[in-house]
């Protein structure tokens, strides 16, 4: 079977499946984080992708609604839960995603109670040569955040991107991306500003780069990031570089993280590109 695409809205997915059924092509929907559409007969893949492109251009075309009526239903057959927001929070994140979020929250609480400096002495990038063998410091800087907006912004993106990677590609892949990007983005940032920095944003930018390029080069992976969001990420880097908003940003970590994510996605999709 071949995965054709994913839709966030299950009714939209059902409309496309119903239409293709009227064209003699049988597709199935599998529910994960989104509604994934699968094709059993891979010889029809080009035809389905062509119809998909037309569907995306104008999903409200009357022929698609007519197809749903012709198939005998106009709903997706899904049962909606009373608390879809809470269900979405749980379903979009795996154990690694939640563990990192919990660690960030606990460290933030500790920083609020006993002070930033006290926590940074234990978790910051090695600020003295005698600390270089305290290996955890090369990674624990990602758990420190210095304002409520800082932690909320980073955790939202971490949940959205990290959760998707973990659900689709496994906890191991998310751990590898996190460890490598934390190490390299931290190294670059300490060259820019010294060891007193913190935040998950370097890892978040790595995930942005990874998810976007992986989706572009290997759509069958089931992960993707809208191009508008990657453009937003680039504009945010530019804004931070030129200090447009007067905010202290870890520009080195952002740039390094993005490059790490793009590089990892490129390597991971080499075989996928060869298959096509």
Curated annotation (Swiss-Prot):
Residues of the active site = 201 (nucleophile), 254
Cellular compartments annotated: Cell inner membrane
Q: Which GO terms describe its molecular function?
A: serine-type endopeptidase activity
What is the top EC class of this enzyme, as a single word?
A: hydrolase
Catalytic function, reaction form = Cleaves type-1 transmembrane domains using a catalytic dyad composed of serine and histidine that are contributed by different transmembrane domains
State the similarity comment. Answer: Belongs to the peptidase S54 family.
What is the protein's given name? Rhomboid protease GlpG
UniProt organism field: Salmonella typhimurium (strain LT2 / SGSC1412 / ATCC 700720)
Report the gene name: glpG
């Amino acid at each position: 079977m071949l995965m054709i695409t994913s839709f966030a809205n299950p009714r939209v997915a059902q409309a496309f499946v119903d239409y293709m059924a009227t064209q003699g092509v049988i597709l199935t929907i599998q529910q994960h984080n989104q509604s994934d559409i699968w094709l059993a007969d891979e010889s029809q893949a080009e035809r389905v992708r062509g119809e998909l492109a037309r569907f995306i251009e104008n999903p409200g075309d009357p022929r698609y609604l007519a197809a749903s009526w012709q198939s005998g239903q106009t709903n997706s057959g899904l049962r909606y839960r009373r608390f879809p927001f809470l269900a979405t929070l749980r379903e979009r994140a795996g154990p690694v995603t939640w563990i990192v979020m919990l660690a960030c929250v606990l460290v933030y609480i500790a920083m609020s109670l006993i002070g930033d400096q006290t926590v940074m002495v234990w978790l910051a990038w090695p600020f003295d040569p005698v600390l270089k063998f305290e290996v955890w410091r090369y990674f624990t800087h990602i758990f420190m955040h210095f304002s409520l907006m800082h932690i909320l912004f980073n955790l939202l993106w971490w949940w959205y991107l990290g959760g998707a990677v973990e659900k689709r590609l496994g906890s191991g892949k998310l751990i590898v991306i996190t460890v490598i990007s934390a190490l390299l983005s931290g190294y670059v940032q300490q060259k820019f500003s010294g060891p007193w920095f913190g935040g998950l944003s370097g890892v978040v930018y790595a995930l942005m780069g990874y998810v976007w390029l992986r989706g572009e080069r290997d759509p069958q992976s089931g992960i993707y990031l809208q191009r508008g969001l990657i453009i937003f990420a680039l504009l945010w880097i530019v804004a931070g570089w030129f200090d447009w908003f007067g905010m202290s940003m870890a520009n080195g970590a952002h740039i390094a993280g993005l490059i790490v994510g793009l590089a990892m996605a490129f390597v991971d999709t080499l075989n996928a590109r060869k298959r096509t």
